[in-house]
């Protein structure tokens, strides 16, 4: 029998931590926040339902739980995503970034035994991509990337030697925008049958908001990724293309690799996309501006911010800060946490051995953080390092400097 007292303790802890989380400042680059509007479907009955009939075929209602709101997916979600990406073909069914990766790779990689090229994890590629390719029966080849530029000499060698079916550009750890057009040019010159897919999970919101270039405009055949990093959506994935045949190939792979596509989350993605159509451009521009300002302020306070020889710190949402050894890094990470500020520690960032704070400014921006909030945040980092103002209210001081959020506050 369930111990109800124990259950009460768990619920009390959950609720108290949830209240605390409402005032926290989250600086994890791979996380963001759902707006109140986008959260609505997650508390609805549709969280419990399947939905397969996206063609709205009147003779195919085998699962009727979502019938009355089907257009929220087939029109609201798909239409807004399509307009944001300027891509007529959208697959909104992946349930995560890795789910989108698996579907894209299976649909576009050709027959087992062929080669899939991805970005070397040591230079910022996703840790799972090469292994995913091998598990799906492909040979894996990797290319290095430096400051957003794929090593062209290495890529030419791979294209000529392996004639790969697919190049899967999966840059996750980067302070630079990925250069896609040069890769597309090389593919066109050396291996015309090779397809080019760009996984822009980390920069999805910056791409769809127009602050970074659209890979499809730069020559990519397809693009996709997760929808909860710089894009303020639910934990889902999405795939885009302008080519009907490639859309169908990914659709066929998805059909055999994914059953439940998490209907409520897909409705949440639709509402988030509708909001993003309104707020997205201003939000995306503010994210990059905030990241660059935060880098400058931290450097002026004596923090070791990753900086190129030309002074460049970031053109994405990511800021990298070297604190010291593992003990020193953990100490300041815990101190910031005690202030209500949550940071991400990584030990494998390109060109920065050892533990590093990998910081992202997207969520703070989404809830209304602009210049004043970024200045307040930099002061709290200095407080945490110096061990002063240890009152647990650092995040509240930052949040008090936030203005209007980049989402609707009042809705019908």
UniProtKB/Swiss-Prot annotation:
Keywords: Antibiotic biosynthesis, Pyridoxal phosphate, Transferase. Signal peptide: none annotated. Its EC number is 2.2.1.-. GO terms for biological process: antibiotic biosynthetic process; glycine biosynthetic process from serine; tetrahydrofolate metabolic process. The keyword Translocase does not apply. InterPro entries: PyrdxlP-dep_Trfase, PyrdxlP-dep_Trfase_major, PyrdxlP-dep_Trfase_small, Ser_HO-MeTrfase-like, SHMT-like_dom. It catalyses: uridine-5'-aldehyde + L-threonine = (5'S,6'S)-C-glycyluridine + acetaldehyde. Disruption phenotype: Inactivation of the gene abolishes A-102395 production. The modification N6-(pyridoxal phosphate)lysine is found at residue 229. One of its GO terms (molecular function) is pyridoxal phosphate binding. Its cofactor is pyridoxal 5'-phosphate. One of its GO terms (cellular component) is cytoplasm. The keyword Transferase applies. Pathway: Antibiotic biosynthesis. Belongs to the SHMT family. Transaldolase involved in the biosynthesis of the capuramycin-type nucleoside antibiotic A-102395. Catalyzes the condensation of L-threonine and uridine-5'-aldehyde to form 5'-C-glycyluridine (GlyU). This is L-threonine:uridine-5'-aldehyde transaldolase. It comes from Amycolatopsis sp. The gene is cpr25.
